């Protein structure tokens, strides 16, 4: 049974084991999954946006095949050479419509984070910032 589609991101990068375990677990429950995560580690960047530079985009079919658990639910894995907030904005503001039209996310999950996000440090966290950015977009899409 297919469930609601989920966008996953993080600040630890596309090769993060936590991100891949989370994707595999949610996919095994039948959720269509789209991952758009930073190409490289982006911890403690807060809500940084890339405004004046081009960002490289890449699909990772090798990672998708490694974490795929349900053949009936779509799973697409992408990286962006940008911040976690860049990833969320690009994904929700048209990127996924172009690259993965079969996945229209209803929810964005950011994590699993490699380290702790505690106390005032959450203000610097790329993981928390990506979730905050997603809340600005997803709440408008599904009203």
Per-region residue spans from a language model:
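Conserved acidic residues
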Residues: 106-107
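Conserved small/polar residues in nucleotide/adenosyl-binding loops
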Residues: 141-143
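Gly/Ser-rich helix-loop-strand patches that form or flank binding pockets
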Residues: 125-139
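A cross-family phosphate/adenosyl-ligand binding-site feature
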Residues: 2, 6-9, 16-102, 135
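DG-centered beta-turn motif at the end of beta-strands
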Residues: 10-12, 112
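A short, conserved beta-strand element in the Rossmann-like catalytic core
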Residues: 13-14, 117
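Glycine/threonine-rich flexible loop motifs
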Residues: 116-125
């Amino acid at each position: 049974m297919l469930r609601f589609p989920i966008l996953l991101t993080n600040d630890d990068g596309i090769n993060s084991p936590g991100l891949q375990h989370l994707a595999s677990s949610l996919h095994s429950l039948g959720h269509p999954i789209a991952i758009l995560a930073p190409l490289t580690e982006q911890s403690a960047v807060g809500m940084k946006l890339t405004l004046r530079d081009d960002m490289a985009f890449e699909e990772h079919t090798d990672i998708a095949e490694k974490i795929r658990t349900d053949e009936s639910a779509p799973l697409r894995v992408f990286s962006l050479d940008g911040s976690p907030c860049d990833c969320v904005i690009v994904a929700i503001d048209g990127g996924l419509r172009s690259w993965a039209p079969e996945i229209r996310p209803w929810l964005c999950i950011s994590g699993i984070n490699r380290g702790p996000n505690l106390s005032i440090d959450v203000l610097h966290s790329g993981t928390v910032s990506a979730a905050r950015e997603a809340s600005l977009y997803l709440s408008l899409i599904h009203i």
